[in-house]
A protein has these predicted regions:
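Acidic, low-complexity cytosolic segments
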Residues: 1-8, 14-140
């Protein structure tokens, strides 16, 4: 495992269709575990969303390896950030800023006239930002 970094970042639409899923290459051998963890986190988003006062849902779930944070847009798009459970570097403020940035990138991506709703997002800016995010603070 890495040194307390981001393991994955995913975006799902309101019908739980995956729009973007980026897994740090250090965690590729754990891709199935991460997939299950992300889906557990999505269930928690569904529980928290109706009661939420803001789009940032905060910490969602933790197990022995990972912890997740969530964000839901006003159109029901869900964003999940998965960090290593031992990550103490990224504070709540940092994670809020990450989601705010990705919300903006998402809005730009879907504003592209060539984007088809319900299909995976093919935005270079969004993919590059997600790849940079999960590459931060990771030691192989």
């Amino acid at each position: 495992m890495g040194g307390g970094g981001a393991a994955a970042f995913a975006i799902f639409d309101r019908d739980h269709l995956r729009l973007l899923n980026v897994v740090n290459e250090v965690y590729q051998k754990y891709a199935y575990d991460l997939e299950l963890f992300i889906h557990c986190s999505l269930d928690i988003v569904d529980e928290k969303a109706p009661k939420a006062n803001e789009m940032f849902l905060g910490h969602l779930y933790t197990d022995q390896k990972y912890k997740s944070f969530g964000f839901i847009t006003n159109t029901g798009v869900r964003m999940i950030l998965v960090l290593e459970a031992n990550n103490l570097d990224w504070k709540d403020f940092d994670i809020r800023a990450i989601f705010k940035r990705f919300h903006s990138l998402y809005c730009n991506a879907i504003s592209n006239p060539f984007h088809t709703f319900g299909e995976e997002i093919r935005s270079k800016a969004l993919l590059d930002a997600a790849t940079d995010l999960i590459s931060t603070h990771v030691e192989a």
